[in-house]
Amino acid sequence: MRLRLLPKSTVRRLSFLLAATVAIAGLSACGSGGSSGSAGNATSGTINWWGWTPTDTATADNYIAAFNKQYPNIKVNYKLVNISDWVAALRPALASGQGPDVFDVQPGAYVTEFKSFAEDLTPMAEQALGSDWKSKVAPIGISGLTADGRLVAMSVGAVYAGMLWINEGTFQKYNLSPPTTLSEWEHVCQVLKQNNVGCFVQGAAQEGFDQDTLQSIANSVQPGLWTKASTGDAKWNDPGIVQTLAIWKQMFGDGIMQTGAVGYQQYPDANNDFLTGKYGMVMMGTWYTQYATNKAMTAALSAAGVSGAKPFPILPVAFPDVAGKGNTSEMYGDSDFGLAVATKSKNRAAAETFVKWVTTTTAGQQVIADQLDDLPALKSVEPNLNVIQLVNPSSQTKPVQDLVTSVGTVTEPRESLLSADVQTAILAAATSVATGKATPQQAADTLQQAAEAAGETFK
């Protein structure tokens, strides 16, 4: 799952505090992004990889072990850096030339922050995949990791949102079908509540997940409107955004949202309530696909405090047409993270070999795909569902396969276009409408004012 990094304002403060260190280390020498290290050997050597993800070092070790089957003479050391320490640790290390050879990059502010320390990987992509390499990679993994015409990092995989996950057993028990409209959604909730089962659970206290639901509602109202507001091509108080907030309010008033949703966190509250069977539906993205497997579902149930629970099948379903306009559910996403090669790396060739293997080879991308957390960057690679043990292959294989296939052409971003200030304003708008402290129009106007105050420009 994509982790949210520090807000841009925090990045700016840390950058200012580190300015003296950076200057002493010769930051200006690497400002152009040109190489100042040495190439070294492409098939041997030791490289250091720093990242905030994978958060489970065992997963990183699995990637490295698979890589070493083909390149046994390249030793890769993975260093997990806490997300809150990322900028403070990485920037001076890269500037001094004593930092990692390979480092994680997330779309958005961090591409801008670290682009001068990273090699342009366009030549590597062309060498690995051909001159038409862009046609072979999920587009969302290119746009978010490119700055000033340079490919700052190569996408490892992406996460997408815009759909729901349902408890298949609960829906079967009460003879229910996944809702396709707002009224059908309300009906499903009525039936489940009559049987003392929760319907839909949301951690409405967390901006990122409120944003997912709002973006999906907006796509039902007017496809692409949310992205246009994010880029300044539409305003946040556009009538379509006002209608989006009105439908959001209706979900609270008509009993789709659970009581107390505004005080809920998506993790751990909503996640645990869904996985323990208290609710039949939850708004999660493609990262939730991992829980379609026996292994991950069993581990998740244990983490949720359920002892000896039997894994149950979950299914991805389209977000309902809540606006009733006949618009199909649109997915949106970002590269979860990409791998960059440091300009000052003394083992640049070996570092590029590692990045190339992880991001552009079938073998490397298959390792990523089979984790069912990130979806691979290469369009030609999909999870091997014949090997992965799903909880109920007969019912889950096709929906999971369809989901994986459908996101390969997604171009609408999820979070990468939004500043921290706008994200904070989105949460304020969502909660003020949900609690009745503001009308949809008032909340939209306040959101627009906050975006303008944050320096966003609009046409």
Predicted regions located by residue number:
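Extracytoplasmic/periplasmic solute-binding protein
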Residues: 147-156, 186-237, 253
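A structural signal for short loop-to-beta-strand junctions that line the ligand-binding cleft
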Residues: 93, 101, 130-169, 326-332, ...
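Long, aromatic- and glycine/proline-rich binding clefts that accommodate carbohydrate-like moieties
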Residues: 136, 311-319, 369-421, 425
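Glycine-centered hinge/linker elements that transmit conformational signals in sensory
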Residues: 191-192, 231-262, 315, 319
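C-terminal capping/gating helix-and-loop segments adjacent to ligand/active sites or protein-protein/ligand interfaces
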Residues: 146, 155, 229, 392-450
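Hinge/lid segment of periplasmic solute-binding proteins
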Residues: 108-161, 213, 309-317
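Extracytoplasmic "Venus flytrap"/periplasmic binding protein-like
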Residues: 66-136, 172-180, 280-281, 299-300, ...
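Extracytoplasmic/periplasmic substrate-recognition and gating elements
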Residues: 254-256, 299-373
